[in-house]
């Protein structure tokens, strides 16, 4: 398990990542990881209630599905956070089949209230989380037939979500792009530029093997200030 403490946007964050125990089903391994993460967070005066973003990793499709189901059970109700899930064998250093990356935040305002906002109609993951003046958006995807069209559709989806969250692109501070291995990062960069989104303060890229949907070629997460 790796734990990192850092300050960002005038707030304190804790990032925890770990691979699940090998030799057990992915949902069981995921539940065990959440227990370990809770213990780690409590050592700093936080808990899973402070989760802002959660990424689920599966070695294969079945592992991702099981791990995501476990996440949905544990981070439910007001504990819901911005979420995404991916398939990537290269993410793992062990023989485990499930892993988690969790981002928790200590709010600058002790009276700040977490406001999870669901999709309409609801899905098994959150649309976005409003928390102490920040908005954490789940990973958005597209089923368009080619990569450049998927980027364009996702940018449009994020635009709609930003409007719903009463913020806008000028307040987006970070985009995380997770791209299907074998596809061209430059295509994504060009499409973001053509949409006028290439000047965002921080854009990071990660290669993965797959997503929840067979047609998805990328997934984009956004973080914005209010």
Where are these regions (language model features)?
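N-terminal presequence-like segments and the immediate start of the first folded domain
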Residues: 1-173, 179-226
């Amino acid at each position: 398990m790796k734990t990192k403490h850092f300050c960002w946007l005038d707030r304190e964050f804790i990032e925890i990542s770990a691979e699940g125990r090998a030799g057990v089903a992915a949902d069981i391994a995921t539940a065990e990881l959440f227990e370990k993460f809770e213990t780690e967070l409590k050592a700093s005066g936080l808990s899973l209630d402070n989760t802002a973003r959660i990424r689920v990793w599966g070695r294969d499709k079945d592992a991702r599905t099981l791990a995501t189901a476990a996440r949905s059970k544990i981070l439910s109700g007001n504990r819901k956070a911005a979420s995404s899930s991916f398939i990537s064998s290269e993410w793992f250093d062990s023989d485990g089949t499930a892993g988690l990356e969790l981002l928790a935040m200590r709010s600058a305002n002790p009276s700040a209230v977490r406001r999870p906002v669901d999709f309409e109609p609801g899905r098994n993951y959150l649309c976005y989380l409003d928390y102490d003046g920040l908005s954490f958006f789940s990973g958005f995807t597209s089923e368009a037939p080619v990569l450049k069209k998927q980027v364009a559709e996702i940018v449009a989806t994020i635009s709609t979500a930003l409007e719903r969250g009463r913020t806008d692109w000028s307040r987006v501070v970070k985009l995380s792009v997770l791209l299907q291995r074998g596809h061209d990062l430059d295509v994504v960069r060009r499409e973001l530029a053509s949409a006028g989104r290439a000047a965002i303060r921080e854009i990071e890229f990660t290669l993965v093997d797959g997503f929840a949907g067979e047609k998805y070629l990328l997934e984009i997460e956004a973080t914005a200030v209010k």
